[in-house]
Amino acid sequence: MREKGKLVIWPANLDKSRSRKGGRIISRKSSLEAPLLRELTAAAEKLNLNPEVEADKKYPRTWWESSGRILVDNNEAKTMVARKIAKTIKEARGG
């Protein structure tokens, strides 16, 4: 069970190949190709969001894939946090 004051961010939330119905929460322009859990963690650390990694968790819509998730501080809206994480990952990838 997640802690109060934390947001759950799944790699699926930032994945460009997913639809909104499939779990993406930011625009396709802002989203990423195949985001990895370690990239999400590194970006959240860089943004000082105090990430807690839960690598064994499975995204409910794709229960057969073990994608993992991170819990980050709930300082602002989830979509804003997701956009910042995606932007940081894009910069780290060199794009």
UniProtKB/Swiss-Prot annotation:
Gene Ontology BP annotations: SRP-dependent cotranslational protein targeting to membrane, signal sequence recognition
Superkingdom: Archaea
Entry GO CC: signal recognition particle
Keywords in alphabetical order: Cytoplasm, Ribonucleoprotein, RNA-binding, Signal recognition particle
A matching Pfam family: SRP19
Primary location class: cytoplasm
Location relative to the cell: Cytoplasm
Tagged with keyword Cytoplasm: yes
PANTHER family in alphabetical order: SIGNAL RECOGNITION PARTICLE 19 KD PROTEIN, SIGNAL RECOGNITION PARTICLE 19 KDA PROTEIN
Family to which this protein belongs: Belongs to the SRP19 family.
Quaternary organization: Part of the signal recognition particle protein translocation system, which is composed of SRP and FtsY. Archaeal SRP consists of a 7S RNA molecule of 300 nucleotides and two protein subunits: SRP54 and SRP19.
Task of the protein: Involved in targeting and insertion of nascent membrane proteins into the cytoplasmic membrane. Binds directly to 7S RNA and mediates binding of the 54 kDa subunit of the SRP.
Protein name as annotated: Signal recognition particle 19 kDa protein
Gene responsible for this protein: srp19
